[in-house]
A protein has these predicted regions:
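Soluble non-transmembrane domains of integral membrane proteins
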Residues: 1-182
Length: 182
């Protein structure tokens, strides 16, 4: 447990660590607090802005997708996608790229009561679950190249709540695709 070379940290089951980052923009300070627990795949994120000019929109984005797990890339890609639950509906988007320039055709931008958003592949999921419903989710996808003829989608999710943008709390789960763990 603890820091190693100030680049990595390891946690035992009963340990947790809180990482606090801040950014000052004009007269506003944005503070992001992230809590990691050694006994959970869930990471807690709290973003708050304080100051005279609280008009900045807050976003939490996952833009690096999930790495492939199968040697047979097509098998892995066929299970991958990006989804969101908004206004009690679930929208799932996916694509199978044939070139490096391919992108998700119908990038999804949804507003309303956003309950969760997720990126998945065959075995793993990264789910973002706000502690209270947020107002905007953007689902997108680009392409990563493996060999001259093999391409894989890279999905991204962005959550925001412009109406109550002074504070936003979101839990992320990144682990096995097992509904009992989420």
């Amino acid at each position: 447990s603890g820091w190693i070379d100030k680049e990595e940290f390891f946690l035992e089951n009963n340990e947790s660590v809180e990482l606090v980052c801040s950014l000052v923009v004009g007269n506003t300070e944005i503070v992001k607090t992230t809590l990691f627990s050694g006994s959970s795949f869930v990471v807690n994120h709290h973003i708050a802005q304080q100051g005279e000019d609280n008009g900045l929109d807050l976003y939490l984005m996952w833009d690096s997708g999930i790495n492939n797990t199968e040697k047979n890339l097509y098998d892995d890609v066929s299970y991958s996608g990006v989804s969101a639950s908004y206004n009690q509906e679930i929208e799932t988007l996916s694509f199978i790229p044939g070139s490096l320039n391919d992108r998700l055709e119908n990038r999804g931008s949804y507003s309303g009561a956003i309950d969760w958003a997720a990126i998945r592949n065959k075995y793993f999921i990264m789910a973002m679950v706000p502690e209270s419903s947020v107002g905007l989710v953007v689902l997108d996808g680009s392409t990563k190249q493996f060999t001259n003829k093999e391409f894989s989608p890279v999905y991204s999710v962005t959550l925001s709540d412009a109406e109550t943008s002074q504070n936003m709390s979101i839990n992320t789960y990144f682990g096995p695709l097992d509904i009992d763990n989420i």
